[in-house]
Amino acid sequence: MMMMAMANDKVRVIITDGQKKVRIPTGLRMLVRRACIAVLREEKFEGNAEVCVTFVDNEEIHRLNKEFREKDSATDVLSFPLGENGIYDVNPDTGAKQLGDVVISLERAEEQAAEFGHSLQREVCYLTVHSMLHLLGYDHMEPDEKAVMRKKEESVMSLIGLTRS
């Protein structure tokens, strides 16, 4: 399992590769970091933040989906927020607000990228943006919530230069 921590003045993104089935393209980790930062900027998030992003395979995300959501299937991304209503635990070592964990199945992302006709990088960044919005409290259970979330996703993807082609 490979870990890579990346930080700037306000955002620490810890990326862990917990799978061996999909080769991580050059530059993907930097794009994921940019996606996390773009969401926080777009949402005008105040203070230092910390988020963990883990890449897994379909088998592992299936296990997590079953354990935590009682859904017996693989999915593309899971979000595990550590805060609620804008209140987050603070890392005592860094003072950063701990937003939570993003878990992405690179296998599923690769399948979806092929299905939608775009790159794995774009798909993983979209899933990162989607999950980051969940960590900040957004949801898509109701049609109006879904519309708001989709608009925010498109706005952030545009900011990082990964619009739909």
Feature annotation, model-predicted:
Residues 1-125, 135-165:
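An acidic/histidine-cluster motif and surrounding catalytic segment
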